[in-house]
Amino acid sequence: WIMGHMVNSIAQIDEFVNLGANSIETDVSFDKQANPEYTYHGIPCDCGRNCLKWEYFNDFVKGLRRATTPGDSKYREKLVLVVFDLKTGSLYDNQAYDAGTKLAKNLLQHYWNNGNNGGRAYIVLSIPNLNHYKLIAGFKDTLKNEGHEDLLGKVGHDFSGNDDIPDVEEAYKKAGVTGHVWQSDGITNCFPRTLKRVRLAIANRDSGNGIINKVYYWTVDKRSTTRDSLDAGVDGIMTNYPDVIADVLSESAYKNKYKIATYEDNPWETFKA
């Protein structure tokens, strides 16, 4: 999965897919009542990027729906996965459940079109704080209560705080999550970071008894780091330059080992070579 980083305006969806992304990451900020409000990152953000692009969350999600609904004039077949980077740092811990509820209602209406030919992309809910695990329950309970439990088949999870893997597993246990787990590792492109924790996450993924299904590394903008990540065995790379990742994937060392994921590739299944 080539994951376009910080895609927060509708125009950027096309921009990143045109560069080779089959997945995007979108920042979601919340208001004081735990409603998803804007797709917005703000300052500081990655070096070399405009941090200030934004939409109202509802508007972005409607644009995203069009980009991922077959038959729509804006449909982009290649875009199959969306990571919502949930900026829950502005919320109190006891608002996490509410945030999950409100996010689910919003996506149900504006993305899934109440289950009536909505967007088809797989969605990863990425939470920065392990203490906010109740957001997952709020989200799941709401879809069940609204009669759309089937849509949970399209939803996966990530804790993005670079916590120790056993602590992440513990949070999932509390949240009742047993699958659909992506594990991120990384740092802003302004600083280097070793692949040490990525390798631990990959070991968990491949152990057969860990909780992790997929591992992605962020934010990777250089060819050398891309190669190191692929050599380590990641499933996804988050980047400001999807064309760089696509270029490296076409090199002889990688083109027979990796393929760019399509809608037919299940993002919740651990890949066995």
Curated annotation (Swiss-Prot):
Keywords: Cytolysis, Dermonecrotic toxin, Disulfide bond, Hemolysis, Lipid degradation, Lipid metabolism, Lyase, Magnesium, Metal-binding, Secreted, Toxin. Its EC number is 4.6.1.-. The active site is at H5, H41 (nucleophile). GO terms for cellular component: extracellular region. The keyword GTP-binding does not apply. Mg(2+) binds at E25, D27, D85. Its cofactor is Mg(2+). GO terms for molecular function: lyase activity; metal ion binding; phosphoric diester hydrolase activity; toxin activity. It is found in: Secreted. Dermonecrotic toxins cleave the phosphodiester linkage between the phosphate and headgroup of certain phospholipids (sphingolipid and lysolipid substrates), forming an alcohol (often choline) and a cyclic phosphate. This toxin acts on sphingomyelin (SM). It may also act on ceramide phosphoethanolamine (CPE), lysophosphatidylcholine (LPC) and lysophosphatidylethanolamine (LPE), but not on lysophosphatidylserine (LPS), and lysophosphatidylglycerol (LPG). It acts by transphosphatidylation, releasing exclusively cyclic phosphate products as second products. This is Dermonecrotic toxin LruSicTox-alphaIC1d. It comes from Loxosceles rufescens (Mediterranean recluse spider).
